[in-house]
Amino acid sequence: MAAGGGRAFAWQVFPPMPTCRVYGTVAHQDGHLLVLGGCGRAGLPLDTAETLDMGSHTWLALAPLPTARAGAAAVVLGKQVLVVGGVDEVQSPVAAVEAFLADEGRWERRATLPQAAMGVATVERDGMVYALGGMGPDTAPQAQVLVYEPRRDCWLSLPSMPTPCYGASTFLHGNKIYVLGGRQGKLPVTAFEAFDLETRTWTRHPSLPSRRAFAGCAMAEGSVFSLGGLQQPGPHNFYSRPHFVNTVEMFDLEHGSWTKLPRSLRMRDKRADFVVGSLGGNIVAIGGLGNQPCPLASVESFSLARRRWEVLPAMPTARCSCSSLQAGPRLFVIGGVAQGPSQAVEALCLRDGV
C-alpha cells in the first residue's frame, strides 16, 4: 500500500523467538533486539533473556534476569539496558532494578525503586531515567515520579503526578514529558498531563473526551492521538457494558485542545489492545482484539497529510497484547497472544521506492 512520495509499507518477518512470551520487555541496542522476561505458556513470569542479531537474523541466549518478571519497563543507557519494576512469579509488583551490561554479557543489580511497582512508565533524557506512576502491592495506583542518576546509582523523588495511574503512555517532546491515560485498578484514566523537566512542574491539559480501556496512543508532528479501545459505559451512551470502538481523538499541542474526529475519519476496524506507532507521517494501528472471536491481523494507517485512513498489508501473525518497539523506519511487533503466547517477531517497514 503506497504511503505517498514513492514510499510504501511492507512486513519483514524475522526468525521466531526461541521462547514464546507475552508482556515481554523489549529494547534495541547496537543492532540487536533484546527480549527480556515476560510470561510463558505456564502463565508465570520468565527470567529468560534473548537477543536477535539484526544483521545475521540469529537468536542468542543471554544470561537470565536475576529477577524473573513480566511487564517491566526498559531503558537503554549507552552499553547498558536498565530493567525497572514489573510483576514476579507470585503476581506481586517488584522493586528490583537490574542492568544488562552488553559488552560483558552479564547483569548487575542497581538501586531498587523506593516502592515496588508494575506498569511504570519510563523516559530517558540526557542520560537520566525518569520513572512515572505504577501500581503497588496494594493494587493502588501510584503518583510517584522518580529520576535515576546512573553515576550515583540512586533514585531521587520529583513532584508527584496530579493523577496517580499505572500503564500510562508517555511521550518526550521538547523539554516536557507528556503522560496520557493509564489505569486506576480496572478503570481507564482520562487525564492528560505534562511534566516540565526544566521547571519541574506539572501542567494539567484537557482530559480525553472519552473513557476507553486498552486504547492505542501515539505522537506525531505536534499532535497526540488516542485510538480505539474498549468504550466504558456511561451516561452519554446506550451501552451497558464495554464495547470495541474505532474512535480517533487528537490533541493539538500548539492549540491545547482535543478534537474528536468525525465518523468518516475513524479507524476502519474497531479494536483494542493493539500496537500503534508513527511511521513517515502516518499513524499505524496493528492487530489487537475486535468483535471477531480471534485476534486481528488487519493493519491500517492514517496519513496526517491526506487526513484519511488506508488499508495496509495484514500482519503475518494475527496477535494481541504484543510488545512493540520502534527503531528507525521499522515498527517491531513482538510476541503477544495468538492461540497462546507467541514467538512471532515481525516489523512493519516504511521503504523508499517500493
UniProtKB/Swiss-Prot annotation:
SMART domains: Kelch
Gene Ontology cellular-component annotations: cellularization cleavage furrow; cytoplasm; cytosol; intercellular bridge; midbody
Subcellular location: Cytoplasm; Midbody
Disulfide bonds: none
Any one GO BP annotation for this protein: mitotic cytokinetic process
Kelch repeats: 1-31, 32-79, 81-127, 128-175, 176-222, 224-281, 282-329, 331-354
Xref: InterPro entries: Kelch-typ_b-propeller, Kelch_1, Kelch_domain_containing_8
Predominant location category: cytoplasm
Keywords: Cell cycle, Cell division, Cytoplasm, Kelch repeat, Repeat
Keyword NADP belongs to the record: no
Keyword GTP-binding: no
Free-text function comment from the UniProt entry: Involved in pinching off the separated nuclei at the cleavage furrow and in cytokinesis. Required for mitotic integrity and maintenance of chromosomal stability. Protects cells against mitotic errors, centrosomal amplification, micronucleus formation and aneuploidy. Plays a key role of midbody function involving abscission of the daughter cells during cytokinesis and appropriate chromosomal and nuclear segregation into the daughter cells.
Name by which UniProt lists this protein: Kelch domain-containing protein 8B
